[in-house]
């Protein structure tokens, strides 16, 4: 494949073009008065969305080079989404502002490497400041406020997530399901989540979200390695007759057996997914036994004289729903409260008897997993399109509340970053010099970009609002929903510190990468040769 190579200013300008396109399409969703974006789908109804990272994932440009710019800034959004689960639009707007200002300086002759050093130092300073300014979160009222803001000012959602956290605890699992009614409901069921994902991505049932969702599956639990597919055949045949999905949780599955499962899954013979059992040694066995109690099944282990090849369908556990992604597996079970309760009592007894603090800690973890249960939010909406939008908002809100519990909250609405700009300028002026100082000032100038965009989306002059906010105390900011300046914490307009921090770090990282780009190598678009004119028989587009 022939390549085209672009150097220096041309390379950076082409990247900038792609970044401009993506940033603009994502930035329109920012703030309480942000608009929606409609995504055309090849199949099914278009999707109406207010979620930065989902929009970013959809954008593909015709020009390869510009598309590289899109991919770079998409990475800032995705990384922020992975770390904090929210704040993707803010990260995109920040990265865009830093790149714009940085490229102006590079074009004027500044050294890109030194600028990047300045940007990195400024980023480290700001991360420390955000940590310092964060307020720890304590009551469910504050949790509700975080959820409300993240779900796009939907108070009902915020309240619901706060209730869910009250019921399952801060470490508890909150999972989303598509409900059957018009209203969004919350229920708490038994269930557990553990930190192992699917063994092969081919098990994913939803390829867009890379998740495997199994409804009412049978669950096969074993503490041995599955090496030969022959061991599994008797069970697989019994399950294929029932037409229900199967989840296999085993110590490991060797290549041959795994390949057979994947082929069956892809051909649609059997809806199956396989996960490695969590933990090691005796602890792995204990956790598998916990799962057996939870799902009302048996652990197939040779210690109990049970062999895989003799397993009957009655020995398998069942669950209402299992959701598996690349990192975690969530089992939502129901109907065996008594057995689960008895198992919890047994674990508590072991905790009282053990001397080792390490064992106590691990037993406590098992108890929390088993007793905490799973809060299931059933998303209700009038149409499929609204349901998808609501589900994305809820997901953001759940992630944001978890991030807030971890690292505390800061004033929201772009306020924190805007207030940190003067502090950064002062610090940079006293500690940095030359082009490093210019790099730090690029970051300082970009810090007001999210606030300005929120104001502009609400139909006001962003620059004026930013200057007004800077002149006020740290907690005061601009409430775009009704257009006045308020104490953000008191008004409940808050962001998780983790979201603000991740967005800033990822934006600075991507900006540094773009500024230090000196050359791009991309595929040359292939020239399509004109088809010869069809003459008589055999010509045209027909097969004879």
UniProtKB/Swiss-Prot annotation:
The protein's name in its UniProt record: Chaperonin GroEL 2
An individual GO BP term: protein refolding
Keyword field: ATP-binding, Chaperone, Cytoplasm, Isomerase, Nucleotide-binding
NCBIfam families: GroEL (TIGR02348), PRK00013.1 (NF000592), PRK12849.1 (NF009487), PRK12850.1 (NF009488), PRK12851.1 (NF009489)
Function: Together with its co-chaperonin GroES, plays an essential role in assisting protein folding. The GroEL-GroES system forms a nano-cage that allows encapsulation of the non-native substrate proteins and provides a physical environment optimized to promote and accelerate protein folding.
Reactions it catalyzes: ATP + H2O + a folded polypeptide = ADP + phosphate + an unfolded polypeptide
Recorded family membership: Belongs to the chaperonin (HSP60) family.
Main localization, broad class: cytoplasm
The protein's enzyme class: isomerase
Matches recorded under InterPro entries: Chaperonin_Cpn60_CS, Cpn60/GroEL, Cpn60/GroEL/TCP-1, GroEL-like_apical_dom_sf, GROEL-like_equatorial_sf, TCP-1-like_intermed_sf
E.C. code: 5.6.1.7
Classification via SUPFAM superfamilies: GroEL apical domain-like (SSF52029), GroEL equatorial domain-like (SSF48592)
One Gene Ontology cellular component: cytoplasm
Molecular function as annotated in GO: ATP binding; ATP-dependent protein folding chaperone; isomerase activity; unfolded protein binding
Residues that bind ATP: 29-32, 86-90, 413, 479-481, 495
Localisation: Cytoplasm
Pfam family name, one: Cpn60_TCP1
């Amino acid at each position: 494949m022939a390549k085209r190579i672009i150097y220096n200013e041309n390379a950076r300008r082409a990247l900038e073009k792609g970044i401009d396109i993506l940033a603009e399409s994502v930035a329109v969703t920012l703030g309480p008065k942000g608009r929606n974006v409609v995504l055309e789908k090849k199949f099914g109804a278009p999707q109406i969305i207010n979620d930065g990272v989902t929009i970013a994932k959809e954008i593909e440009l015709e020009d390869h080079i510009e598309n590289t710019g899109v991919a770079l800034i998409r990475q800032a959004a995705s990384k922020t989404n992975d770390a904090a689960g929210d704040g993707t639009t803010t990260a995109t707007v920040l990265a865009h502002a830093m790149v714009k200002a940085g490229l102006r300086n590079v074009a004027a002759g500044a050294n890109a490497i030194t600028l990047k050093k300045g940007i990195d130092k400024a980023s480290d300073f700001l991360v420390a400041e955000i940590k310092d300014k964060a307020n720890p979160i304590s009551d469910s009222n504050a949790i509700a406020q975080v959820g409300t803001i993240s779900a796009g000012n939907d108070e009902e959602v915020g309240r619901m997530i706060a209730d869910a956290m009250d019921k399952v605890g801060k470490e508890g699992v909150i999972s989303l399901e598509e409900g059957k009614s018009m209203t969004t409901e919350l229920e708490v069921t038994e269930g557990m989540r553990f930190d192992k994902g699917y063994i092969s991505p081919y098990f994913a049932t939803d390829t867009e979200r890379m998740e495997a969702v199994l409804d009412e599956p049978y669950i096969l639990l074993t503490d041995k390695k599955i090496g030969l597919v022959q061991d599994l055949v008797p069970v697989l045949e019994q399950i294929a007759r029932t037409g229900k999905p199967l989840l296999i949780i085993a110590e490991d599955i060797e290549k041959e057996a795994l390949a057979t499962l994947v082929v069956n899954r892809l051909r649609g013979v059997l809806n199956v997914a396989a996960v490695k059992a969590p933990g090691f040694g005796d602890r792995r066995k204990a956790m598998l036994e916990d799962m057996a109690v939870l799902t009302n099944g048996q652990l197939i282990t040779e210690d109990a004289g049970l062999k895989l090849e003799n397993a009957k369908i009655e020995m398998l556990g069942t669950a209402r729903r299992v959701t598996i992604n690349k990192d975690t597996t969530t089992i939502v079970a129901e109907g065996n409260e008594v057995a689960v309760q008895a198992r919890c009592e047994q674990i508590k007894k072991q905790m009282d008897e053990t001397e080792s603090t390490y064992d106590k800690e691990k037993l406590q973890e098992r108890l929390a997993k088993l007793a905490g249960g799973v809060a299931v939010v059933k998303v209700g909406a009038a149409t499929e399109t609204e349901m998808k939008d609501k589900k994305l908002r809820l997901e953001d809100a759940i992630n944001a509340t978890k991030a807030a519990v971890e690292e505390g909250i800061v004033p929201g609405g772009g306020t924190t970053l805007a207030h940190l700009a003067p502090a950064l300028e002062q610090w940079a002026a006293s500690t940095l010099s030359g082009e490093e100082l210019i790099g730090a000032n690029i970051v300082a100038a970009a810090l007001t970009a999210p606030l300005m965009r929120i104001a502009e989306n609400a139909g006001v002059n962003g620059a004026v609002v930013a200057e007004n906010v800077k002149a006020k105390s740290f907690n005061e900011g601009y409430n775009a929903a009704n257009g006045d300046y308020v104490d953000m914490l008191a008004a409940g307009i808050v962001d998780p510190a983790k979201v603000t921090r991740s967005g800033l770090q990822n934006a600075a990282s991507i900006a540094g990468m773009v500024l230090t780009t000196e050359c791009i190598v991309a595929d040359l678009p292939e020239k399509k040769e004109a088809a010869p004119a069809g003459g008589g028989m055999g010509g045209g587009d027909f097969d004879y």
